[in-house]
Amino acid sequence: MKPSRETCLHRENIIPLGVGYARKLAEEPAGFVGVPQGGTLFYCKTLPLIHLIIINEEGHSMSKKLVSLFLAVLMIFSMTAVMAEDSAITVTDMFGREVTLSEPATRIVVMQPSDCEILCAIGCEDAIVGRGQYVDYPESILDVPVVQSGAETNVEEILALEPQVVLLNSMSQSEEQVKQLEENGVKVVVSTTSNIESVYTAITLIGKLMGKDAEAEAVITDMQTTFDDIKAKSAGFDKSVYFEISPLQWGLYSAGSSSYMNELAEICGMRNIFADQEDAWLSVSEEQVIERNPDFIVLITGMGSEGVDEVLSREGWGDINAIKNQKVFNDDDSCMARPSPRLKDAAIELYNFVNEIEAGEEPAA
């Protein structure tokens, strides 16, 4: 028996033809799911197969062609819904926040240098529509508009660039700034790194965000292969190194055991003189450096050759092995300063520095 129009119109759960139709099938034996011109579309779950019936205003079944038309429309709606669901992306950022996009990001503002380098390494440079003021690598990125970053982040500048996503560091922006961005429809994704494993996590996160999972995995594999090769070559090399992140004039800062710099030292067969300190980054004194007497000094201060000259001439440092033997290295291209895919290059530079001078071995690359 065909359900009458009057019987179905009294139902409260009237829903449009589309995704909700499937849900309705599971809840009702028969239901009203839409009003095509001149008739009503019903389904009847009590039949052996789901049976669609269109009844016109006089209560008579309408043509099979019209039924076929509505079936086709239903299939289109269902396929569209499935495609939208398949293209949606959900990531959990490195601050534990779940972020969902309807599709991979195509317009992104990146606030910190390391994340920009990750984006470029996985082939997403064209998606960058804005950059923080310290984002300067690769050189081709310098044509991208700059926005204020850190405590002075200008939300209006960012919104004017119409990004889908802002990628930032957990220490860089305030909760209020994040709230403003999200209230204006911009997704905020937080990336924060201190050791090599967290760099891998950031690469994976950003790769998923951009729909570039395979490219992200390839970057990680390349880094791991380089690290493994250098570590194998460095077996038995037992020297110590001091990483200077902030120069004496601003207060000495160095790297502890939970930092990627400590891991770079280990990869190259060296001991970080502050490996007994758990913090990734820590304030240190001249007395501590002198007492621990490093064989090598690596500067990540951004002061160039002037920084090397200043360290070599420091009063009271003359008995340090690295000073006596003039084994002070400056990170000219900042690859050691940034937890990005270029840590691979940092490991190569460090290996080449200590081995070309110390052991005369062939460079790593």
Regions found by a protein language model. Name each.
Residues E85, R107, T153, S198-T201, ...:
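Structured C-terminal subdomain patch of bacterial secreted/periplasmic proteins
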